[in-house]
Amino acid sequence: MKSQIQVLLLFFIITVGYSQPKLSFDLGLGLYQPSLTGYDENEIFPIKNTLNRNLLFNWGVYYEFFYNARIGISTLTSIDSKDSKNFTLDNQSSADFSRRITYRFFPIETFFRWKPRIEINFTLMPIWGRSTISLETNPPQQLDDWKSFLTMFSDTEIGLSEMNATDNMVSNWYGYGSMLGFRFYLTSRMAFDLKSGFMNNTYDEKLWYLRGNKVTGPKMKIDGLPIFSLKILYGLR
């Protein structure tokens, strides 16, 4: 009886040990090629290049809830900016400009070990996208500066009577995507992960909000985009 209890206890310990989910954190870079015509058609915006147009900064956290499946959250962010010395509005005023496009993924990932160090994975991911445009203007002309800025995208008058020296306009949208990945384990906890796939986004330039008021923002074609990512990850058992 004692030996049977010992065997059952050993089996329980092994089962619990192997069934514990794994938590992993990753950092990396993404690459894609959007069509941001709303920025390209206006010369005051920074000239497009690989850093401000194609490169995405990536971080993510994944939770292994089954022996061959993970869920998590991952973000890819594009950043652009221009200081007031080089950013002059049509009303001859200057401002500090910054722009972010962030794609928040909520991935469901399945995987299998092809070899001890090599993993093949497939990811499906709902997307919550957000873009933010910020202007840091000089009081007391911040309202005029914002009006001048928005005329680059639309002739519609905004219904605002005041603005802060630093303010921003925001747009949110939803989308989906999928990716096929290859992972190489350097150790049992550290690995490189290379993925490629596509994403579709339902962005609408007419659905921007500035201090609660709906405004028109830049035209961006970010649907049907191929996307690549390379990241390094560390797993916590």
What are these regions (language model features)?
Residues 4-15:
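Sec-dependent N-terminal signal peptides
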Residues 19-74, 233-237:
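Short glycine/proline- and aromatic-enriched beta-strand/turn motifs that initiate or cap beta-hairpins
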Residues 21-23, 51-57, 95-104, 118, ...:
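Residues that define the transmembrane beta-barrel architecture of outer-membrane proteins
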Residues 173, 178-237:
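Predominantly the C-terminal beta-signal and adjacent terminal strand-loop region
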